[in-house]
Amino acid sequence: MKRVYFIGIGGIGMSAIARYFHARGFNVCGYDLTPSPITDQLIKEGIEVHFSDDLNMIPKAFFSPTDSLIVYTPAVPADHSELTYFRSNGYRVVKRAEILGEITLIERALCVAGTHGKTTTSTLLAHLLKQSHVDCNAFLGGISNNYQSNLLLSDKSDLVVVEADEFDRSFHHLKPFMAIITSADPDHMDIYGTAENYRDSFEHFTSLIQSGGALVLKYGAPVNPRLGSDVSLFTYSSDDRQADYFASDITIRDGRLFFTWHYPGGQLEEVELGVPVHINVENAVAAMAIAHLNGVTVEELRSGIASFKGSHRRFEKVLDTERVVLIDDYAHHPVELDAAIRSVREIYSRKHIMGIFQPHLYSRTADFYQDFARSLSMLDEVVLLDIYPARELPLPGVTSRLILDLIENPNKTLVSKNDLLDYLHGNEIPDVVLILGAGDIDRLVIPVKQYLQTLC
C-alpha cells in the first residue's frame, strides 16, 4: 500500500490519522465538505484536499485498488459518490476507528473514553508522558495548545494515547493496554436508542482491555466493568476519598489553582494545574493515574501538570482584557454546558456573562432541549444560533426555539450565524462572552474576537 485517501479528512480524528500516514511517507490526500482551519493546515503540510464530491478531483494515482487504502468517517453520508465508487470497485474501505484499532494492536494503547472530558484528559495524559522520560505517540480529539497538533509521534516509545470515541460504537475496534472512562452519561441516542444500550457499550469496551492492563474508572460512574482476571481496576474522583486516586485541598490563589493528588501509597502536595479551571481537576487526577502507572515519576507529574496549556476549544481563553474576556468551549451536551457555565460563574462571579450557543444535531436537541435550557438559564444573557445539523436531516418541530422558550432568563434571543456580529454591534457587550458548541460555530470565534478587540 502506497496511498491513503480520506473521505472526511477535515475531522479532528481523521486529520490526525492523515498526518500519521503522511509522516510515514505515504501519499495522502482527501475530501471534506468545507474548508476549515484544519484543512488549511493540512494543505500547508503538503496534503492535497478538495471540497467537491467529485471523482475527477481525486489524483489519478489513487485509482489503483491494490495500492490505495480508503478511510472514511461515519459522519459521511452512505450515498456519498466517492465512497460509493470505492466500495463498488474493489478497494479496501475502512472506518477511521478500524485504522486506530490496527494501530492499537502493534502499540501499547492508553485509551480515554467517556461522554465528557476525554479530549482534555487524553491531551493532558499525552503531555504528561511526552514531557517525561517515558514519551509517547498520540492521536488526540483536539489540537493540543502545547504542541499545536492532534498527532504526537515518538521514535523511542511504543505507548500511544488514543481518544476513544463512542459514536457509532467506534471504540469497539480498539485494543487498549490501559483505559480511562471519564463518564457514561447517555448521548448519541440516535445510535444507541436507550441509556442502557449506551452504558452497555462502555461495558463492552472494558472487556477489550488486554491482559496485564488496567482500567481507571471514574468513581460512581454507572459502568460495571467486564475485565479479564489479570486486568487491574482503579477508581478516581476529584474529591471522593473512597476512590483510589483523588484530589484534596483544592484552592485558587491569585488566579492559580493548586491541589493535593492522592494515589495508592502516597500523595503529591501543592500540584499546580496549568489550566486553572475546577472542572479540569478531575481530568488531571485520571491522567496522572495512568501516567504514573506507566512509569512517569511524581516530580515529572508535577512539572507536566503545571506546564499543560489545554486544548483548542476546551475552555480556551481566546481574549483576556480588562474590558472583556472571550472563552471558547466545545460543550455540546447538557452536562458539558452546565460544567462550562458553572466554571465561568466560579471564576467571574461578579461579571455579566453572555453565552452564545449553537445546538449540535436535531436528535440531540430533541433528546435534551429541557436540560440545555436549564443550563443556559444560569447565564445573564443567552444568544442561541440555529441547530447545526452535521450528518442529520431536520426533524419536524425541532428547532432552537424549543430551547429558547424554556430558558428562564428573559434576556435571551435567537439569531442566525450571519447576523451574530450585527447583533453584537447593536447591543451592549458584557464582561464575559462564552462561545459554546460543536458545530461550525468555531468559525465565528475569530470574527467575534476581532470585534471585541475594537472595544478595548
Curated annotation (Swiss-Prot):
Primary location class: cytoplasm
Localization in the cell: Cytoplasm
Pfam family, any one: Mur_ligase
Coiled coil: none
Enzyme class at the top of the EC tree: ligase
Gene Ontology MF annotations: ATP binding; UDP-N-acetylmuramate-L-alanine ligase activity
Identification of the protein by name: UDP-N-acetylmuramate--L-alanine ligase
Organism field: Porphyromonas gingivalis (strain ATCC 33277 / DSM 20709 / CIP 103683 / JCM 12257 / NCTC 11834 / 2561)
Underlying gene: murC
